[in-house]
Amino acid sequence: MVTLDFSAMEAKWRDAWYEARINESEPEPGKKKFFMIFAYPGVTGYMHVGHMRGYSVTDAIVRYKMMTGHRVLFPVGTHATGNGAIGFARKVERGDPATIEQLKANGCTEETIRSLSDPMEVVKFFSQVYVNDYWKRFGFMSDWRRFTSTVNPDYSKFIEWQMRKLMSLGLLVQRPYFAPACVEHGPVAIDASETDISKGGGAEVLEYTL
């Protein structure tokens, strides 16, 4: 009976694809073009299988387009602005047991864990984890040279331009916005169950207008 080593097969062909650089895209006049991107993951910690399911769908589409004669551009990035990285850094800073244990279980040294009390270090650390430990391990056809993050200076300039453009067209309106928040963990909680994350949710909800 033949025994197949699927892990070895996976590594063999993944390495062959990247060595051949078939994932990299350059302009090619006259060839059909196709652009693909998935929603940047927030830099809030390690991913779960649900993330990879969605990303695998985009990769399947990209591969189909490549096989049907398209020049495909498939960049990736991380959503590092907002409260995600800040919230994670605060957990590390105050020594949240579950967060520290998760980092240790994933092989982080004490030095690395201490550094993750800085939100920018959280962004740098998990951006590398997402690319190297998840997306590349899955063999995605992303052009890794085109990785970006929403905290990169050039990306920030793009957002500034976008906001000014929308403002000039009268498409931005400032109004009161109501959202759940936690005075300990910071705004804005995704839903009421996250207003006391440290106790597993289900906290009492009090409404205020600030």
Q: What spans do the regions from the language model cover?
A:
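N-terminal, positively charged nucleic-acid-binding surface of large information/translation enzymes
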Residues: M1-L210
